[in-house]
Structures are given as C-alpha cells and as structure tokens.
C-alpha cells in the first residue's frame, strides 16, 4: 500500500514523500524509512494518523487502520536529550562565525556552543528580511539582536520593507519595545496558523470542511510562492510606468494630451474647452454618459477643431466631459484617422499621414494628476538612515 507522509521538522520546514509498504510492516521499521527520507532521527519521530498518535513500535501499520492512499503526519519532537557530537541531519551548513554580532568583537575566538546559539538568530534575521514571520516563540533570539542585524544590512532591510511592512515600520520607529511587540504578535499568529494547519492535516480525510480549508491553504501558498518568484525574477513588474503624454496646441493654447489607444473617442474637459474658447461650438444634442472604470457626464461634442502637434495641424473632434481631471485625451478615433503609431522603442508618437514624430513627455513634465506618487521613497530612505545612525549611537 502507498502511504503519503507529511513531515514537519522542528524548525517548521516541511517535506512530503510517499512510501510503499505492506500492511504488516511494523511501525518501528516504518520510522526507519521515514528517517531516510526526512533526515529526522528515529528517536525524534512521531507518527500521527487520524488525529491519533501511533505509539507501539512493534505493532503493524495495518493494526492501526492504515490502508492504501492514507496520509500520516510526521512531527519531530523537541530535543530528546544530549546527542553525540557531530552535525545533526537537519543542521544548516552555513557558517555564521564571520558575522560580527553587535556588542561583541568579531576577532575574539568563539566557543562552539556560542556559535551554534548565534546561528538561529542569523537565520531568523534572513527569514524576517525575506518577508517570513518567525515561526515559534520557543528558541526566539534577542529582539535587540535581530533589530541590530536588520539595521546593519541595507539589502535585508529593503526586503523587509517590501514583504513585511508592519515589522519594517516598527523597526524604523526607533523603539525596541515597539519592534519586540510586533515581532511577538507575528510569532503568535504564525504559531496559531501552524497549529490549525496540523489539525487540518490530521483530520478525517473525508471531512469536506477540512479538505476545503486545506485546498484554500494550498492556493494561498501557491499565490505567495508566485509573488516571491516574481519579486526575484521580474521585480520591474511591481513598478509603475509613466503614462504617454505629448505636447500639443488647441486654438493656440498649449496642452498636454494623454495618448490612449484604448479609448474609443477623443475627449476634453469642460475647463480645458473654456480655456481654449471652443465651448461656443459644443453641440449639446450629443450629451450622454461616458462609461469606463467609472462614469462621466458628456456635455456635448465639438464636431471639428484643429489640433497642432509639432508643425502639423490636424482635424479632430472632441467630446466634452463635465468633470474630468485631465485636459485632453487622444482616443482611437483621432489616432486611426491620422494613422498614428506608438513607437515605444524610440519613445515617440508617429503621425502616419505626415511622418511627423513627437516625443512622449518624461514624468517631470506630466500634469500633476498623472504623476506617480513622489516623495515617499525619499522619506523612507531618510527614515532608514536615521534609524541606522540612532542604533549606532545607542550601541556605542
């Protein structure tokens, strides 16, 4: 029969594997096979099936009610006692001996026990920076140490701001007490989620509610993994792009027009039409409602006007909107009429009927309503610098 094992190690790392065994296979031998797959020592393995802990090692799996296709949970016990010297199977091979811990000298020789105690703290710092919430309250390193390690590493600090904003905000507040409170609260939440997840995995496989929750958890894990991969492989997808604007003139008045090939018609705001002195030409029989992301009331239509782009004077019609933040939008009707093409490689709008090219405006020249939110990044950088300097003064 095929048994699927869902393994949760002491450090809350997970692994899933399947074992082909017979119903008369003893539990102790099953644990030996699990040790080879999970790298968890036999004496630290706990097997749970249907919310029941399997205790008698000499009993067969069939006597416990296991059958083909069943799922069991493997939990690693806490430290069961002193182990022989040497590397534990799941001990990380990363050497953190070269890390200078705040308050100590990196040149001073370290006792092996001290080095092993520092390693989890360094791992927690890396986990926090990658957006991961620390898993359990037991084995928590000093919040002051974690805070100092994050403040001393700009890369980890930037990752923390992206993936764990509440903790980053507490870190940059300059208050160790606030940072400790947020850290402990996130740990409690993570511990509760882990308990709920273990309860679901050990529940009755035929329980529809439990299966629905497991399905939702798997979906959320896939979403989180997809986002993390995108952050690593395509970080530019999380940035904002500058919209396409060009300089033009209507009735001699300079304007900044938004080029939108997805808009059906060319529109102009009522305020802009009044500045350009073309409100007298508005045909109110064409009043209506423009629908898109929202709705806007159309006052009417200017059937024919001239728009100047560079040295070209082009015929154009405008639908006048009552309450529109941008002055003018060049829609597909105007772009098609004059065979315009958007060349993003050269960053120009090409007028097909005349061959004239006009450059798209940089962000600094865009109307205020279309500029990206600025100033936040600069203030955040100042906060980081202030926190690092403040932390350095406190340590010295």
From Swiss-Prot:
Gene3D superfamilies: Acid Proteases (2.40.70.10), Phosphatidylinositol 3-kinase Catalytic Subunit, Chain A, domain 1 (3.10.20.90)
Ranges where the record places region Disordered: 82-130, 374-396
Keywords (A to Z) from UniProt: Aspartyl protease, Hydrolase, Protease
InterPro entries, sorted: DDI1_N (IPR033882), Peptidase_aspartic_DDI1-type (IPR019103), Peptidase_aspartic_dom_sf (IPR021109), Ubiquitin-like_dom (IPR000626), Ubiquitin-like_domsf (IPR029071)
CDD domains, sorted: RP_DDI (cd05479), Ubl_Ddi1_like (cd01796)
Tree of life domain: Eukaryota
Pfam families reported for this sequence: Asp_protease, Ddi2_HDD, ubiquitin
Active site per the UniProt annotation: 260
Residues annotated as domain Ubiquitin-like: 1-81
One Gene Ontology term from the biological process aspect of the record: proteasomal protein catabolic process
GO molecular function, one term: aspartic-type endopeptidase activity
Regulation: Inhibited by the proteinase inhibitors amprenavir, indinavir, lopinavir, isovaleryl pepstatin, ritonavir and saquinavir.
Biased segments, Polar residues type: 103-128
Enzyme Commission (EC) number: 3.4.23.-
Biased amino acid composition, Basic and acidic residues: 379-396
Function: Probable aspartic protease. Seems to act as a proteasomal shuttle which links the proteasome and replication fork proteins like RTF2. Required, with DDI2, for cellular survival following replication stress. Together or redudantly with DDI2, removes RTF2 from stalled forks to allow cell cycle progression after replication stress and maintains genome integrity.
Family classification: Belongs to the DDI1 family.
Name of the protein in question: Protein DDI1 homolog 1
Organism: Homo sapiens
């Amino acid at each position: 029969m095929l048994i699927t094992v869902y393994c949760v190690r002491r450090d809350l790392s997970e692994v899933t594997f399947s074992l082909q065994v017979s119903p008369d296979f003893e539990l102790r031998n099953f644990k030996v096979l699990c040790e080879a797959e999970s790298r968890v020592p036999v004496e630290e393995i706990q097997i749970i099936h249907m919310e029941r802990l399997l205790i008698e090692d000499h009993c067969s799996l069939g006597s416990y009610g296991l059958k083909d296709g069943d799922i069991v949970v493997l939990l690693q016990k806490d430290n069961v006692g002193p182990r022989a010297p040497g590397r534990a199977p799941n001990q990380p091979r990363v050497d953190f001996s070269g890390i200078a811990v705040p308050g100590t000298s990196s040149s001073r020789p370290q006792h092996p026990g001290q080095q092993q105690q520092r390693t989890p703290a360094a791992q927690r710092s890396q986990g926090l920076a990658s957006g991961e919430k620390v898993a359990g309250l037991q084995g928590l390193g000093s919040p002051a140490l974690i805070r100092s390690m994050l403040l001393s590493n700009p890369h980890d600090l930037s990752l923390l701001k992206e993936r764990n904003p509440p903790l980053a905000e507490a870190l940059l507040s300059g208050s160790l007490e606030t940072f400790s409170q947020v850290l402990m609260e996130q740990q409690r939440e993570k511990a509760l989620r882990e308990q709920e997840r273990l309860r679901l995995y050990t529940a009755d496989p035929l329980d529809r509610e439990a299966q629905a929750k497991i399905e939702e958890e798997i979906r959320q894990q896939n979403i989180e993994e997809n986002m993390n991969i995108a952050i690593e492989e395509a970080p530019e997808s999380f940035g904002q792009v500058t919209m396409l604007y060009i300089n033009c003139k209507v009735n001699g008045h300079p304007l900044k027009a938004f080029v939108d090939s997805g808009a059906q018609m060319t529109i102009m705001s009522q305020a802009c039409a009044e500045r350009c002195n073309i409100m007298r030409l508005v045909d109110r029989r064409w009043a209506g409602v423009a629908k898109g992301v929202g709705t806007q009331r159309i006052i009417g239509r200017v059937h024919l006007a001239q728009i100047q782009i560079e040295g070209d004077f082009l015929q154009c019609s405008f639908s006048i909107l009552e309450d529109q933040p941008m002055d003018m939008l060049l829609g597909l009707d105007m772009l098609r009429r004059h065979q315009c093409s958007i060349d993003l490689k050269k960053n120009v709008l090409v007028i097909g009927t005349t061959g004239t090219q006009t450059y798209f405006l940089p962000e600094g020249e865009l109307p205020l309503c279309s500029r990206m939110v600025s100033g936040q990044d600069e203030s955040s950088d100042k906060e980081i610098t202030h926190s690092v300097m403040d932390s350095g003064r406190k340590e010295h």
